[in-house]
């Protein structure tokens, strides 16, 4: 029975009764109060008996979540086991918005002049590439119990799965993929947050420099071009101020300065650096641009420490 405080759609609601009376074992995948999917649990013949004895050893469907740090210069993605919270894979890419401006002010001005669509589209494309790469890496990180699934796939598919597990070509329906990601949590500074969502950054470049959206958001990932499970969620943490964004909110959640007796200082050093000072009695936050120091912005000589940089050494010959 679906409780009144549980949200789902008519397709899943109609499937619940059919699958409840079938002989197969099913897992209900939900986040908070929303049912997202029903997946078969690949189990042995004694699965029902084992489940009654609370010693169930069936192979559950894959369940991933992902975390995206949308930085001004670098975008980093983490793939996590949705049941244990274990980090399974990490992947990073350069932020393609750099071609439209090295810092948030330049990008905001570009968006005001040319629109937000180009900046939104390019960063969503790279996030999808990161998620795809993470799912490929997960194929090597997760132990797949092929023996328990052998009755669910043909011998041909089994051989392909074994090859995929060994890092070779080949795949099958139950191998890890982006469709097994049910939630993506995304953080970034306020400008990156707005440009990702396609929101005008005008409020950030004019006084009083306030974000257009401050509260946390739970959205349907597909509505914003993020390719995960078709009903997967996109979670964005709240922005604090015009240049203190959701990435700082993530730091606060991790460090919990608001619960400490002693005064602590948190530094998030990047192209835009944020600082929070305080304890459980109060917190103060500020930000400052660090691009010139760490990213090589507006320097006359030299370059950023990129992977493909070259060092030249000049030797002096004695006269």
What is each model feature region?
Residues 1-67, 72-74, 84, 121-124, ...:
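Nucleotide/phosphate-binding catalytic cleft detector across ATP-hydrolyzing
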Residues 3-5, 9, 101, 111-115, ...:
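Alpha-helix initiation/capping motif
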Residues 5, 55, 95, 109, ...:
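Detector for Asparagine
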Residues 44-56, 136-176:
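Intrinsic disorder/low-complexity segments
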Residues 71-72, 77-105, 203-216, 250, ...:
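Glycine-rich phosphate-binding loop of actin/hexokinase-like ATP-binding domains
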Residues 102-116, 228-235:
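Gly-rich Lys/Arg/Thr-decorated short loops/hinges at beta-loop-alpha junctions or inter-strand turns
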Residues 111, 235-239, 291-299:
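Short beta-alpha connecting loops at secondary-structure transitions
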Residues 115-130, 134-135, 302-319:
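Conserved catalytic alpha/beta cores of large enzymes that bind or transform nucleotide phosphates
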